[in-house]
UniProtKB/Swiss-Prot annotation:
It is an enzyme of class 3 (hydrolase). The keyword Cytoplasm applies. Its EC number is 3.5.4.27. Belongs to the MCH family. One of its GO terms (biological process) is one-carbon metabolic process. The lineage of its organism: Archaea, Methanobacteriati, Methanobacteriota, Stenosarchaea group, Halobacteria. It comes from Halobacterium salinarum (strain ATCC 700922 / JCM 11081 / NRC-1). Keywords: Cytoplasm, Hydrolase, One-carbon metabolism. One of its GO terms (molecular function) is methenyltetrahydromethanopterin cyclohydrolase activity. This is Methenyltetrahydromethanopterin cyclohydrolase. The gene is mch.
Length: 311
């Protein structure tokens, strides 16, 4: 397979070429690292969010929007389709890089993770990248520092000038859009956690509503998770059957009936204290090649409306 970071670099170049049209910004740090602002100091938008999601999946997923409803309200929805879901979602899109350098904190996703490849899922998908450039998207309230960029370069094994850092707040249009593009990722990662071979997922598609942009990060985290857990729908075509497909959907979690903001409760919540079942799509359909078709879960528009603050 082509290098994930090579494919993502082409998308980063596209972002740099169309910064004005996408309402994003770009600059170089003193280290030579390129920072692309998708939604920290710049507004970004739907198209910026779609490109951000493509960057996070290293171009292996088709990401687009359509208009649909949540209750009686109209919302854009993000659709994702992918024929390499194990590599695209677990090897790139998963937010598995916790970056903390001095006072700067961010959650990293994207193909630079595959240059490090120390997370367990890389062994499961049998993929490690080797490339001279690294693309890591950062979910953070601030733009990256030179020290943070140097840390990324050191861990990825590339020069600081070869690092590209698309950055965004959860509470931004691009943040809401890219979060809605994580339906398939949640399903594939949940299957991996449950012991299913992720490479047996042959193709995948999903959709979820784009959460209203919140005024603060905590509310944004709640709304974007609600969009997935109560509004996300996923279809998988798989090679092998499994007796725990039903545990993938969010309704398997103990507090399924509550908006995410009520599940986490406080500003200092820890994801490690939350039932993993919450981080799943609302509905899952699985087609087993040569076998049965399974369907689990349901969309909960009532919980979505509550979490989105619809009136």
């Amino acid at each position: 397979m082509e290098s994930l970071n090579r494919m993502a670099l082409e998308l980063a170049d596209e972002a740099l070429e169309f910064t004005e049209e996408l309402d994003i910004g770009a600059f170089e740090l003193d280290t030579g690292t390129t920072v692309i602002d998708f939604g920290v100091e710049h507004d970004g938008g739907l198209e910026a969010g779609l490109l951000l999601a493509e960057l996070q999946t290293a171009g292996l997923a088709t990401v687009q929007t359509r208009v649909d409803t949540v209750g009686d309200a109209t919302f854009p929805h993000v659709e994702v389709a992918c024929d390499q879901p194990a590599v695209a979602m677990l090897g790139a899109q998963k937010a598995g890089w916790e970056l903390a350098v001095d006072d700067y904190e961010a959650l990293g996703s994207g193909p630079a993770r595959a240059l490090v490849a120390t997370e367990g899922e890389f062994q499961a998908i049998d993929y490690v990248d080797a490339f001279e450039f690294a693309v890591l998207t950062l979910e953070s309230t601030g733009l990256p520092t030179t020290a943070a960029a140097s840390e990324v370069a050191a861990r990825a094994g590339v020069t600081e000038e070869s690092v590209f850092l698309p950055t965004y707040r959860t509470a931004s249009v691009a943040g809401s859009v890219s979060a809605a593009a994580r339906t398939v990722e949640l399903a594939v990662f949940r299957l991996y956690e449950l012991g299913y071979d992720p490479t047996d997922v042959l193709s995948a598609s999903g959709c979820a509503p784009v959460a209203p942009v919140a005024g603060d990060e905590q509310t944004a985290i709640g709304r974007t998770n609600d969009a997935l857990a109560h509004g996300g729908r996923v279809h998988l075509t798989v090679a092998e059957d499994f007796d725990a497909f039903d545990a993938v959907v969010s309704s398997a979690a103990a507090r399924y009936d509550d908006p995410f903001a009520e599940v986490v409760g406080t500003d200092d919540w820890d994801a490690g204290d939350v039932d993993n079942g919450v981080f799943g799509p609302a509905q899952l359909t699985v087609d087993v090649v040569g076998g049965p078709t399974h369907a689990f879960g349901t969309v909960r528009e009532d919980v979505l409306a509550d979490g989105f603050g619809l009136s």
